[in-house]
Amino acid sequence: LHYVGGHTHGLQIARVWTRRGWMVLAVDASHYYMNFEDIRPYKTVHHVGDMLEGYRLMAGLADSPKHIIPGHDPLVMERYPAASKEMDGIVVRLDADPLY
């Protein structure tokens, strides 16, 4: 776990090892891909400077931008394969190669 601040005071992100390498679960540090990809903080922020520093930290902790998973982006469900046929549209495998 790594403290990033930004959206709320005390916010943390998780760095996890997968078969693809180091991934970062951004949780609320980045709601959407566009937030960290385009360096676009969202409106409800405790401290903008901490949020921007959090984007830099995520980039440094993850093996690539494709290894950062935002907390609320529906695109996650499109960019990663389902955990199983029965879980299609419900659960995806973040350790699998992305579909994009």
Predicted regions: what is each one?
Residues 54, 99-100:
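Binuclear metal-dependent phosphoesterase catalytic core
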